[in-house]
């Protein structure tokens, strides 16, 4: 190969040298060029950008050059052209396409051949490493934690008492697998943690490994699937191969639904083949556990309904543990765990914070404590006070306070009436949660005011009357605007959307409508053509499971429920109009009212 390149360079170099020598033979001084023209030895002349080229008259001499070149002199060109005209020698002007010497054109093919040779040699030198690069691409991306200090324990997991009890068997198995082998028992090879986002599924999995003092492999389902078919399966094989080398260990796959969705519906589109191959390999690896394999696979998802049934059969993820939202006692424990990391003022009441955060998950509570610490640091405090915690709660519920957004006097008054309409109807209906705060300070991207209600206790069931009263509260703001100002605004848009959705669910899903019987008319969430369950849709937005006549009856019943709620809200507002005016005026003045102030003003109006 090298000798071939040497010969090629010599040949091209010789051709280049001959071209240069040939070009230099016909170049003559300008005076001689003029003399040849005067003697009539030039048949025609080309005028180039930087030279004259004269073609010799044929037949003068066999040894004479066929053409002559000389440098162009623009100062004497006028005389030269006049002389050529007198002698009848034709001339033409020719523009150079590229200002390159002729010999450089020989270098262009040489450069091209050199580039091709370089690429060929580079490909030859790297051919031996391609297989190594492909192997590296198929390596898993899971993080390995082996030091006990890097892994959590059950003490770091507040709440979830039932889940920890359920998973303690896994810890015992990882610590002493021989005890189960002696009895002929087999622990579940896979455990599926199911729960809403932020409930602590990942932390709980790490705590299992920490309690058992075993290596912990942590990966996300999306890390297995790539655009190249076969890469995900290779990564699964590599992960389980390394896990087996560790002996007793725990493999955690977060967001399992990214790789474990239902297979086979609708054919293959895009990366569907790659995901299915990855899932098939995962199923194969879990089938390969023998009785002496002290390895447990834990998966976590918040979308268990879209997982492939093969993942959930016995021998794979056959134990399912639900991680639910924390109740009041668990929220207290979670807040106490996170509060240990900040300087907390003795006056901060974590019990009150737990009571105000019903429905929030552990990640939300951790964020509240962190936001409170940031707010305390911003005001230069030495400890996090209760006010900082409440401000952090409101920031999470309603958004960032925007005192820089100034409302006009009329808009501010309309917002005040609107929020007092919500607060007043909620205070007058005994089934509704008490109001904790009313404000007309803008928050978030679009909220011009807000009313916060604090649940008396954790709730899991709601009666029909409670839902109907909730509709009254939702429509109370709009009714108060209309009664007090005499007009309607766009501020009730979200209230109308929420009220319509709630009324439609009463009729379609809960059997709480009149004249429609007990049929549940809301279809289950359908699977898309890829096998993925469609996301949450408003009630009635999916395919209908009823006739056109029933659909019209549903719409009529929803309209009736909303009309009744509006009439009840109007009766409450009209019956307590002085209280509405007094509370709205006070809110307009101070911009924020606490729940105690509101209840005191409502009670004084009742007296």
UniProtKB/Swiss-Prot annotation:
Gene3D superfamilies: 1.10.8.60, P-loop containing nucleotide triphosphate hydrolases, Peptidase M41. The active site is at 419. Keywords: ATP-binding, Cell inner membrane, Cell membrane, Hydrolase, Membrane, Metal-binding, Metalloprotease, Nucleotide-binding, Protease, Transmembrane, Transmembrane helix, Zinc. One of its GO terms (molecular function) is ATP-dependent peptidase activity. Its main location: membrane. Zn(2+) binds at residues 418, 422, 495. The chain crosses the membrane at residues 3-23, 100-120. It comes from the Bacteria. Acts as a processive, ATP-dependent zinc metallopeptidase for both cytoplasmic and membrane proteins. Plays a role in the quality control of integral membrane proteins. This is ATP-dependent zinc metalloprotease FtsH 2. It comes from Sorangium cellulosum (strain So ce56).
């Amino acid at each position: 190969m090298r000798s071939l390149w040497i010969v090629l360079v010599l040949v091209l170099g010789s051709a280049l040298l001959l071209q240069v020598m040939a070009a230099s033979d016909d170049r003559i001084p300008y005076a001689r060029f003029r003399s040849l023209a005067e003697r009539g030895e030039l048949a025609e002349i080309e005028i180039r950008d930087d030279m004259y080229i004269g073609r010799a008259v044929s037949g003068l001499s066999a040894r004479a050059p066929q053409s002559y070149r000389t440098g162009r002199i623009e100062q004497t060109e006028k005389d030269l052209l006049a002389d050529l005209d007198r002698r009848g020698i034709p001339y033409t002007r020719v523009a150079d396409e590229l200002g390159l010497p002729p010999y450089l054109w020989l270098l262009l093919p040489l450069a091209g051949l050199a580039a091709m040779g370089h690429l060929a040699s580079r490909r030859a030198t790297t051919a031996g490493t391609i297989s190594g690069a492909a192997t590296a691409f198929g390596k898993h991306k899971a993080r390995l934690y082996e030091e006990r200090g890097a892994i959590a324990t059950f003490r770091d997991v507040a709440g979830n008492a039932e889940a920890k009890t359920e998973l303690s068997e896994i810890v015992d198995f990882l610590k002493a697998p021989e005890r189960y082998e002696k009895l002929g028992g087999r622990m579940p090879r896979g455990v599926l943690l199911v729960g809403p986002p932020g409930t602590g599924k990942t932390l709980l999995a790490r705590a299992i490994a920490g309690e058992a003092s075993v290596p912990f492999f942590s990966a996300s389902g999306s890390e297995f699937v790539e655009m190249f078919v076969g890469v995900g399966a290779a990564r699964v094989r590599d992960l389980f191969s390394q896990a087996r080398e560790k002996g007793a260990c725990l493999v955690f796959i977060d967001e399992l639904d990214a790789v474990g969705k239902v297979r086979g519906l609708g054919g293959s589109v895009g990366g569907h083949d790659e995901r299915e191959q990855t899932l098939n390999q995962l199923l194969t690896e879990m089938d390969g556990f023998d009785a002496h394999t002290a390895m447990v696979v834990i998966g976590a998802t918040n979308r268990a309904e879209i997982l492939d049934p093969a993942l959930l059969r016995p021998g794979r993820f056959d134990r399912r543990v639900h991680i639910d939202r924390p109740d009041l006692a668990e929220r207290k424990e979670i807040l106490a765990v996170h509060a240990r990391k900040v300087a907390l003022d003795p006056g901060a009441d974590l019990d009150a914070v737990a009571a105000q955060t019903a429905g929030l998950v552990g990640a939300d509570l951790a964020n509240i404590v962190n936001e409170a610490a940031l707010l305390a640091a911003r005001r230069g405090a030495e400890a996090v006070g209760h006010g900082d915690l409440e401000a952090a709660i409101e920031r999470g519920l309603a958004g960032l306070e925007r005192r820089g957004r100034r409302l006009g006097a009329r808009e501010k008054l309309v917002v005040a009436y609107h929020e007092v309409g919500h607060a007043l109807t909620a205070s007058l209906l005994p089934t509704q949660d008490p109001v904790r705060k009313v404000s007309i300070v803008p928050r978030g991207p679009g909220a011009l005011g807000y009313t916060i209600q604090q649940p008396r206790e954790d709730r899991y069931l709601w009666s029909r009357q409670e839902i109907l009263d909730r509709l009254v509260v939702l429509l109370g703001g709009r009714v108060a605007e209309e009664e007090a100002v005499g007009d309607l605004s766009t501020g009730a848009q979200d209230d109308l959307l929420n009220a319509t959705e709630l009324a439609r669910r009463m009729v379609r899903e809960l059997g709480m409508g009149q004249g429609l019987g007990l049929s549940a008319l809301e279809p289950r969430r359908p699977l898309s053509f890829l096998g993925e369950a469609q996301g949450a849709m408003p009630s009635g937005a999916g395919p209908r499971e009823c006739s056109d006549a029933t659909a019209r009856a549903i719409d009529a019943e929803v309209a009736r429920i909303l009309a009744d709620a509006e009439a009840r809200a109007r009766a409450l507002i009209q019956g307590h109009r002085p209280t509405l005016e007094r509370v709205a005026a006070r809110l307009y003045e101070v911009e924020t009212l606490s729940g105690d102030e509101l209840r005191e003003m409502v009670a004084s109006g009742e007296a």
